[in-house]
A protein has these predicted regions:
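A short, Lys/Arg-rich alpha-helix, primarily the initiator
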Residues: 1-27
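Helix-to-coil/beta transition segments that act as allosteric "coupling" elements at the rims
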Residues: 174, 199-223
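Recognition helix of helix-turn-helix/homeodomain-like DNA-binding domains
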Residues: 29-45
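Regulatory sensory and allosteric helical modules in signal-transduction proteins
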Residues: 137-199
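Allosteric cytosolic regulatory segments
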Residues: 245-253
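DNA major-groove recognition helix of helix-turn-helix/homeodomain DNA-binding modules
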Residues: 47-67
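Regulatory loop-to-helix N-cap segments in sensory/regulatory domains
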Residues: 230-245, 259, 263
Length: 322
């Protein structure tokens, strides 16, 4: 029998090449320093990461590494048949359908979105490297029948982002990565916002290094996108990871009403002001909502959700006039 440290020695040799170490780390979903700690014995991989590690290794090393890991970890065979990073469990999918079937209409969007984002954050960032996931919604069509902007809504993050990102929501337009994904109805990844200056318009915020926007579609119509940011470069290179993101995006789509999906031809996004400019307008948002709820005339029968949407429309109109 091999010594328990044999798998660490083998891993140390494999990750001796810095480029290969970085590639494997990206595939596993951890920092490259984490791989080094596994190799030198200062930390132990979580059970779910053992399978990811095997899949990320070059083919010529997998069989030998699997033998070493099976000797060091008696439960490796059990881990091998469990769902990996690239899969969403059928149990969780049924949970989402159950919520959709039983939740009240006015709570459906928030409840489903938050439930899916909580699970996605745990599965996509198990090591809490740093990730933010936000549901970005199309604003309703303006008076000319066109959709001119998008709005961030439900959002969750792991450190260095705050847990609940909904209070930090802002408008996004043609200048943003989300805007590009919604306009083209195609996924839009940027692997390094500090280096990538291609045609993709990135809306870079604090801590964000790589990002992906995945369109939320139904019957060839679009409702917005799922916007995910990571503190790590190249975080969205892994095909299994992007497939997982697609699955979570489809589940988020269940939070929307059919009429919230719009024909792509009416998407005509405008440029939106920067974050600091927008924040000055958001300070009185609650006052706007209360004024609409207390209003008379055509606005007097609004419920809270309707008043909030009307307040967002007022803010959108004001920002587009700047």
């Amino acid at each position: 029998m091999q010594e328990p440290s044999a798998w660490r020695e083998a891993l140390s040799e494999i990750i001796g090449d810095p480029a290969e170490r970085e590639r494997i780390a990206n595939e596993v979903g951890v920092r490259s320093i984490t791989l080094a700690r596994w190799a030198n014995g200062s930390s132990l991989p979580r059970p779910q990461n053992l399978r990811h590690l095997l899949n990320a290794l070059p083919k010529q090393h997998r069989s030998h590494m699997q033998e070493l890991l099976e000797e060091a970890f008696s439960d490796l065979a059990t881990i091998e048949v469990e769902h990996g990073e690239e899969e969403i469990s059928s149990k969780f999918i049924m949970e989402v359908f159950d919520i959709r079937a039983t939740i009240a209409d006015q709570l459906r969007f928030w409840t489903i979105s938050r439930h899916v984002l909580q699970k996605a954050l745990r599965q996509l960032d198990p090591e809490q490297v740093g990730m933010a996931i936000t549901v970005v919604r199309c604003m309703p069509p303006s008076s000319n029948g066109k959709i001119l902007s998008l709005r961030e809504s439900v959002g969750l993050g792991s450190p260095p982002w705050g847990g609940d990102l909904e209070e930090k929501a802002l408008f996004l337009g043609a200048e943003s990565l989300a805007g590009y994904a919604v306009t083209t109805c195609r996924p839009a990844p940027i692997q390094n916002l500090q280096e990538d200056r291609t045609f993709l318009p990135a809306y870079q915020t604090e801590n964000e290094v790589s990002s992906i926007a995945y369109p939320i579609m139904f019957a060839s119509r679009i409702a917005g996108c799922l916007l995910i940011s990571s503190t790590e470069p190249n975080y969205f290179l892994s095909q299994s990871r992007t497939s997982l993101i697609q699955g979570y995006t489809n589940l988020v789509g269940l939070a929307f009403e059919p009429e919230e999906f719009y024909p792509p031809e009416i998407i005509q996004l405008r440029m939106m002001p920067d974050l600091e400019t927008q924040r000055t307008y958001f300070t009185n948002f609650r006052q706007r909502v209360l004024a609409l709820l207390r209003g008379t005339g055509p606005e007097q029968s609004l419920n809270t959700a309707q008043a909030e949407l009307r307040a967002w429309q007022q803010l959108e109109e004001a920002l587009l006039q700047l």
